[in-house]
């Protein structure tokens, strides 16, 4: 089926259900960022493979919303279809809610799968439709169309595993007790744990159910006297089932969550996070007494304990060795005049990571973007879209690994030949932004909103900006994007020691260039004085930053010192694990810069 045929099939299904339109989001029952293939309907229907998008189909038009990371990619992937691409957040572009209000009339109905839409968003759409006398109905008409083609992936059924306290620093019982303490503070007695990363953190549960994210499709239900894991039968070994039982955890089938909620006593008080709860489950929870608030697990898992931090540091040493060896391979291949494509870059990098102990998969699909392709922040080479690396300009490589001791995310932008003056200027500004974020010292009440400006200052000075956050939290053997902390203009979360964050400013000029430099950082205690409690960042990523493009005279003394100190630290941490040739290469790349 073509994209337009799939859209037509949605119209027929909506009409047969007595409705006038269909909405599909990139979401699942767990409000996940990366979806199990079984739930990832939007790319199949639209042809757009980016994240955080919404498709609306009415009887006479269709539109898809994407954020600033994907404008260029969406325009390309939707070309030739009837779907109108909506650049969310751009001037003059309506929000999804505004569009629904404009395109639905009195008595008309919009269908969506309530189990795959966050409650807060479903309620927003209900309100928008109500303004015109229209309504929303929770009904999944997309799945039968997809199922009938035989192209829909099955739900995962492989064996899960439990991480050990030596990896995580805590048992399931320890973490259940932490959650119960937070429920008491909130005046609640029960929590429906829906996020796969939250279930994974709570019970030390891991699997291979999502691409690049080692989590299991499951729910958990915590009350003051019980904890239940809802997961497909047969997915845990007898030994792991017994380990969970020792922590007071019982097992039920994955589909039984809503029935279990309905069966609880009427006086059970649920702490409900509308943003993290699908609409179908939300309706079941609100049949009980509720207290509105964030799922406490988000904040708890955002602060890594000492065992996790020790493992994360080891993880970055291993990853640093792999990436340094890749850098050597890349430099050698280019010097020999070998023709490399963007997909070749991904293959070379995966090969080096696979040599590392404890590595088991990438933490996201590698972005290897040559030249103007890098202006698309989340570009992916595939099929015919796979540029050859030419001997000029930049190659941007953004990737990461999943290890048995942590999760990594790193971006480097490599010069692969002569550069223009503009490319050198842009690179230097991005480096300055990266450094200013990394060397920030701040009081312990600062939020991601406040800290974001540390990085934007150097690019803003030249009236340049990037349409995304500066950084995101990173999970522990979990999702590479993890909250609640982030570095972005609208994040109110206060930073605390033990949080990890990426530092990844960039410049993206369509049809010209894309540059990003990314390290992971650990938020650390910097001491107290009469002015308060101070925090800062320590680098976790241990990979040299290309210095050839840098306009050294534009760096401040503090910025230059930071760069030289960082490279000295990289050499100190990695050299014991390298052979003599590798040490010599790394020493050259980490040599201090001077004016």
Segments (PLM) and residue ranges:
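Active-site neighborhoods and metal-handling regions in enzymes and metal-associated proteins
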Residues: 1-595
